[in-house]
Amino acid sequence: MSTPQSKAKPSAAEWTVQDATELYRIGSWGEPFFFVNANGHMAVRALDEAGTTMDVVDIVNELRRRGVQFPVLLRFQDVLRAQVRRVNEAFRTAIADANYGNISRGIYPIKVNQLHEVVDELLDAGRPFGMGLECGS
């Protein structure tokens, strides 16, 4: 019985951005928003015309400098808005491609995250798609 050979782990000096990207499988969960930057830090890409990026380590260091108590929650509204648009457009495309004679309305289960800022952002982003809230149990 043979076992697959695992790739030798690189030393810290040999570690690359690609190594981090593969190890943490960022391509499967983070694209197009999250990536490992040239410094080897987790970074966030805003989907604006300027191509703004934010180094998460820089954000954490700035919060520490300001005396903010940890843990903290970092919320990137561009990500929420873009994902609402992405899901709704995917359903619209599938409905059109299948010549389905009805519509789809996204419903956000409020028990997932009740924070006012999150719910407002999701509802605002979902307004063009008729998105609503599910408040049941």
Feature locations, PLM:
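A charged N-terminal "starter" segment
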Residues: 2-136
